[in-house]
Amino acid sequence: MMKIKIIFSYDGSAFLGSASQPHKKGVQDALSGALSHLGIVSPLLMASRTDKGVHASYAVASVGCGDHFVNLEYLQKQLNKFSHPFIHIKKIEKVKDDFEVRFDVKSREYRYIFSHSSYSPFMASYVHFYPKFDLDKANELLGFFVGKKDLKFFCKSGGDNKTTLREIFIARAYAYKDFSIFHFKANGFLRGQIRLSVASVLKVLEGKMSEKELKEQIEAKKQYNHFLAPPNGLYLSRICY
């Protein structure tokens, strides 16, 4: 028996979330099903969890498989036959037996994509259509998140976190063509943290919340915003070990 690391992407609009679901509608269920077609039935472990409608351009999972799978490129090709169209296997690597796909992670990155173009139903599941905003101001507000923070007011209920302390390495905004993108990198994220953060920044940009209130929420003094940004604009974009 050997352990492999699977790097893959997925279209979150096709699933009820990344974790296994009662009705087998999670990314984990679909990928486990694809593996079972190849005779790999060991439990599949995921590095990160995403909510319904959230996408991933770079996700990681691990699973045990038989030593006879020596040609990992061939395994990748065969696995894609059963994973498409909503999951794509980008790479498969052999890892050490003590590799922990979730707990060995050093950092995770997410991007939230806004489109400022005319609404398109074909893009609606993949971007958040939103009017243009002051990108410099957004960058200033996102900067408040950087550092070691107690983000208890940026967390949905139902998580299994032992602590709400997180270290944010990057929180910035940048433009690409007719899109604005928020980029977050941290040692870990709480459930709903990014969508709550994005929605809070938008509230300040809209004049519905003050900078002082945003800072107080980040400093865990008081919660002013309970709303989450829509899931469709959010992408898990990198996991580093």
From Swiss-Prot:
The active site is at residue 51. The keyword Transmembrane does not apply. Its EC number is 5.4.99.12. Disulfide bonds: none annotated. Substrate binds at residue 110. One of its GO terms (biological process) is tRNA pseudouridine synthesis. This is tRNA pseudouridine synthase A. It comes from Campylobacter jejuni subsp. jejuni serotype O:23/36 (strain 81-176).
